[in-house]
Design a protein with these regions (language model features):
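Short acidic, low-complexity intrinsically disordered linear motifs used
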Residues: 187-195
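Active-site microenvironment for binding and transforming phosphate-containing groups
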Residues: 1-187
């Protein structure tokens, strides 16, 4: 069994994923952050929230998020507490894009142990599109998910109706300062930034 399939089977043993995700479609305040999620059998579920950095505590350093089409996923510690985050990215300079908010957040706060990756890959996006056309299901049902366990990162195309992983890949995350450089200045930030 692949890693994400095992996590989905554990977290959603008796629960419909679609109903759980749709229950998060609630209006949030106008700040750039939200803290919405849940812990399901030891796995933190961090949903996508439009135009937000949605963070949620991840006490076991194991988290799962869905509906990636260009957003980033991160895990970090703040004041000794581990969080997972789904960071909304619409393209630099576009309304609702949270990269500058994230970059400022990690550079001005006491943030450590940052792991950052982009769950969507071109190959997964093509597979997602093919499966949506083949099955007639929407991209909210045949979706790209991200999964972080410890320092390992994974992406997958999954069918949330069937709780089934269609394809999974292990990703190489950006970890710590040595892999994160701001292109314009060449300076190393205090932690991982989104370029």
């Amino acid at each position: 069994m692949c890693v994400i399939q095992s996590a989905i089977s554990t977290a959603f043993v008796d629960i419909n994923i679609k109903e759980k995700l749709m229950s998060y479609s609630i209006p949030c305040d106008k700040s750039s952050f939200s803290e919405i999620g849940c812990n399901m059998n030891g796995i933190s579920i961090v949903p996508y929230i439009e135009s937000k950095i949605n963070k949620y505590q991840s006490p076991n350093s194991e988290s799962l998020s869905f509906q990636f089409s260009g957003c980033a996923m991160a895990q970090y510690k703040e004041n000794g507490v581990t969080y997972a985050a789904h960071i909304c990215l619409y393209g630099m300079g576009n309304e609702g894009d949270c990269r500058e908010v994230w970059n400022e957040f990690i550079q001005k706060r006491e943030i450590t142990d940052v792991i950052l990756f982009y769950p969507k890959t071109e190959a997964l996006q093509i597979l997602q599109s093919e499966k949506c056309m083949e099955t007639g299901k929407s991209p909210q049902i045949i979706t790209i998910c991200g999964y972080i366990k410890g320092e390992k990162c994974y992406s997958a195309v999954i069918d949330i109706d069937e709780k089934k992983v269609i394809k999974e890949i292990e990703q190489i995350p950006l970890i710590g300062v040595e892999n994160c450089i701001i292109r314009e200045t060449g300076k190393k930030p205090s932690s991982c930034v989104i370029l």
